[in-house]
Amino acid sequence: MFNNKIDKNIRDLLNLISSSRFNTYLVGGCVRDIILGYTPKDLDVLVEDDIDEFSIFLSRSLNSKIIKFQNHGFETFRIINTKTKLNIDITKYSNGNDGFLNDLSMRDFTINSMAISLNDGKFDFNDIVDPFHGLEDLNNNLIRYVSKDSVLFDPLRLLRSVRLSSKLNFNIEENTKKYFMINSEKINIVSNERIRDEIIDIFALNNSSKALILMEELNILNQIFPEIQLTNGINQGGLHDKDVYMHSLATLYFI
């Protein structure tokens, strides 16, 4: 069922990876997007073998360059495929199956913690590695944290939940929402640059006003934009039927 939704360029790329001798998995948001019928802009690949050797193999096969960087302390190789405009991020996992499952356990949300094996010359989106029941949450339109530790590992995930909820029209699961509300101040330890990038992506959504309302519910809005929060309850008088805050949201809705 899911295999029929895959873009041809991505299918060719996955065939290339799965036909190699390396033990690899496709993981994260790209798995979610393909299941939902979207074409992902980025692919995340986990490799058990020599990450340098696999990255060289893939970059040469695609005639693309490699960028090496640290992502939350993990060595990551990024290959930019100029043909498909895809970013391919490659990360190594260790200690066999335990290391692989540990990687999935540190991902942000259950819908992003699914994986597909790219081994033995084949891949099958109907055979999903899903230890945290992400597919069930995907079918129920829910965003749920994998664990409390996974949220605190990178508090930007508080804001990312808002973007995903608004983008996919999903609800944030109640226990997850309560935990986010309690820990909303953790967003302040994230760099301004990363928050800025996430906010830009939120404002690019068609329903960014809904995202701001959700940010308020999660107590994130007053952490990032205290000036906006202060307009809540300020009457404008005259012919206005909304306070300054709701008027601003209505304006954003029509932009």
What is each PLM-predicted segment?
Residues 1-255:
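Catalytic cores of the polymerase beta-like nucleotidyltransferase superfamily
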